């Protein structure tokens, strides 16, 4: 009898041990699976606007100029795209949404779906191919392929688009449907234009800038930057709310110092260091060229409201860092353009052509500068010259 009880006790103990080990193994397996299936998504991009005299964003043609993208990128004007208009360069809006890119990180291959809504704008460029472009962009089903050795598209030009690939993100593959080929990239890329309220108002009066946060959330970091005749300077404002008046920056600092503080803001907002470096490398030539501009990190709530993002399955981590870029038209810029406008009726064709080219060196920004000059110009002859330029078609849509 005692032996029977002893055997029963031993048997129960063994059962408990085995059961415990089994439960522990299942938990370890679930934890490992969860870790392997963990999806991390990071995004960066830029909203570019131009401040009017009252601080409100001007209406302009953001795509008026030569394209800065590789030829394989899909556009709404391209026959490969899903929509077609005569000339996307004639689109007018307050804001240019530039190069949002979505990065994906996972330890194993995953199938996901991604859709970005843009209720107050339209998508103008994207890659890889999308399923639809109705009130935003929908890529449909995608495959995340960590470690895959894809031959990524290239047109062998020196283009800032490629800098966004310099991260550890997993390649993304869009399977071809309806005769469209399979396409892959290190990210999902999209651009667009829209008219919507941004939180920061910027107004220049002589050498004083008035900045106003019109939103309900603090703006984590604001950087006022100026490059005038090759000399640069900047000011930093952290945790900004309400209103502040600031002098234009003293031009006694170098661009590398500005980049350091901007990079710190990007990383503090959640981007990986390689992502922040890729963003700065992408936009360095444009962000720090001649001119006065204000950079700021958009509050996340505004990003989500402007660009609602739906990813299935839901990521374990989602970081979205959109940088606002407000261009400020300075008196020096207006004077330089006005000088060239005065040459447009010169008897010499060579002088007129040189003046036209000088004005167009401002690229997509020449039209807003002319509009501001027109507001104050009293000379009817000069006004007529400016109006002729403003009424002309876009320089290039592609």
Locate predicted features.
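Hydrophobic membrane-insertion alpha-helices, especially the h-region
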Residues: 8-20
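Protease-labile, long low-complexity intrinsically disordered regions enriched in Pro/Ser/Thr
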Residues: 27-343, 350, 361, 365-375, ...
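Helix-centric, low-specificity signal for extended rod-like, repetitive segments
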Residues: 17-20, 345, 376-378
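Juxtamembrane cytosolic interface motif at the C-terminal end of transmembrane helices
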Residues: 20-26
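Conserved hydrophobic register position within alpha-solenoid helical repeats
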Residues: 355-356, 386
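Positively charged n-region of N-terminal signal peptides that target proteins for export
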Residues: 1-6
């Amino acid at each position: 009898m005692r032996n029977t009880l002893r055997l029963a006790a031993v048997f129960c103990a063994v059962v408990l041990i085995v059961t415990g080990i089994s439960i522990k193994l299942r938990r370890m397996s679930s934890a490992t699976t969860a870790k392997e299936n963990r999806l991390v998504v990071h995004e960066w991009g830029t909203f570019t606007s131009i401040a009017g005299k009252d601080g409100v964003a001007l209406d302009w043609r953001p795509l008026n100029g030569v394209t800065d993208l590789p030829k394989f990128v899909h556009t709404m004007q391209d026959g490969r795209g899903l929509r077609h208009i005569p000339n996307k360069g004639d689109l007018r809006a307050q804001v240019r949404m530039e190069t949002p890119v979505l990065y994906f990180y996972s330890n194993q291959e995953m199938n996901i779906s991604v859709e970005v809504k843009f209720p107050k704008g339209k998508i103008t460029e994207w890659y890889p191919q999308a399923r639809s472009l109705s009130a935003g962009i929908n890529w449909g089903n995608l495959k995340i392929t960590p470690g895959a050795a894809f031959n990524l598209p290239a047109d062998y030009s020196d283009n800032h688009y490629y800098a966004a690939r310099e991260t550890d993100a997993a390649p993304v593959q869009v399977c071809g449907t309806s005769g469209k080929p399979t396409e892959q990239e290190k990210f999902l890329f999209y651009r667009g234009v829209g008219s919507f309220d941004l939180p920061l108002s910027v107004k220049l009066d002589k050498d004083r800038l008035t900045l106003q946060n019109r939103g309900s959330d603090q703006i984590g970091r604001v950087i006022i930057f100026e490059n005038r005749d090759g000399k640069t300077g900047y000011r930093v404002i952290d945790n900004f709310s309400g209103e502040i008046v600031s002098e234009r920056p003293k031009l006694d600092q170098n661009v590398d110092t500005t980049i350091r503080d901007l990079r710190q803001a990007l990383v503090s907002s959640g981007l990986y260091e390689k992502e922040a470096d890729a963003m700065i490398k992408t936009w360095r030539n444009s962000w720090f060229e001649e001119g006065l501009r204000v950079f700021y990190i958009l509050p996340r709530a505004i990003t989500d409201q402007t660009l609602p993002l739906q990813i299935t399955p839901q990521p374990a981590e989602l970081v979205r860092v959109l940088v606002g870029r407000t261009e400020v038209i300075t008196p020096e810029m207006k004077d330089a353009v006005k000088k060239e406008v005065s040459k447009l009726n010169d008897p010499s064709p060579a002088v007129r052509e040189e003046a036209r080219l000088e004005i167009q060196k401002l690229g997509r920004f020449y039209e807003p500068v002319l509009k501001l000059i027109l507001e104050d110009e009293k000379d009817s002859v000069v006004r007529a010259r400016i109006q002729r330029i403003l009424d002309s078609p876009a320089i290039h849509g592609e």
